[in-house]
Amino acid sequence: MDFKVKWSGKSIEYTEEEINAVVNVMRTADPQTQGKYLIEFESAFSKYIGGQPCFGVTNATHALELIADLTDVKKGDEVIIPSHTYCASAIPFGRTGAKLVWADVDSDTFLVSLDSIKSLVTERTKVIVVVHLYGMIIPNIEEIVSYAKSKNILVVEDCAQSLGAKLNSKVCGTFGDFGAYSFHGQKNITTLGEGGIITLKDEAQAKKIPGIRHNGHAPFLNKIEYWIPAMSNVDLDIEGIWPHNFSLTEAQSALGTVLLGRLDSLTTSRRERAKKFRQSFVDFPELKFQKISNESSHSHHLLVAQFIGKESGKSRDEFLSLLSKKYKVQAIVQYYPLNRYDLFKKMGFGHANCPNADLFFDNMVSFPFHITMTESDFDYMIDSIKTALIELRG
């Protein structure tokens, strides 16, 4: 189908400075991975989030893989995860053999509910994964972390969609024990389509990450000769954890450092557009948006709403059909509840008591919201949605 306003796989346009940063690495960097540009990016990102240790990786899923390793989750343990999130929030913990337990979401924020978490905690609960979905920090994240600490449970923040959001002056990913960030091609900033960062509070755990991230390799210390016994050491003490190769390239790292410099301005632009969009529908009860108590806590990665059909007697799917076929606006649906996935069903995780998540998913709409969309296309989308909603009323 040919759309006038389509769902884009590209979140931003690179500046000449950003392009030149990549070209410079292509021409001059030696090595092309695990070099000075990675160190600079990790340092810049650490400064941005307040000083916690940070490590660049290939993507946020691999950041969560490393976190799953470091939490030592295993068969017999339980990991609580919201049922409404992208599958990558859960798969790394599923690999461990632990039991995945699905938590419900709050009906107003569409984010994981503390009450649901409390109802699911058992003596076997080892980790709670919270997801700051659509760009919004969970409003009561501090309460969730406090509760988890009282139960000796680790908190992992999936910040893949929320970079740029802050709550009480704290950046997402710094409330819990671990944080994972994404620079995928559709995220608010992207390092050539893929990329990620892991952050954590525990300094002792942080020392293990370079080895786990890169096949156990680390420079020999106090060597008499640089070649004895070999150029790199795979005997680094990582306490029995099998290492991976999740290395971020030098080109991606150099680009990431430059992109961080305009993250705040990009976030401001997204907030302004999101505000305009939401205000355009104050007289349209058919669309229920996330409840936002603190604007700075939202980086507006995505623009989502719950379709309420009481006004028109129509369904979400009828709305999407009209919007796409007549007005050529490509709105989509996200994210399939994880307990409904065939993968998780086959693994024994097909049960959940998540009525809010089910209701939201069955009626949710995600509108195109890439920053490269022209103002005229953005206005056209708003006008088309209004017209479609009125048309559905009959």
PLM regions and their residue ranges:
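Conserved PLP-anchoring active-site segment centered on the Schiff-base-forming lysine
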Residues: E65-T122, V127, L323
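Conserved PLP-binding active-site segment in aminotransferase class I/II-type PLP enzymes
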Residues: M1-L70, K74, V130, I144, ...
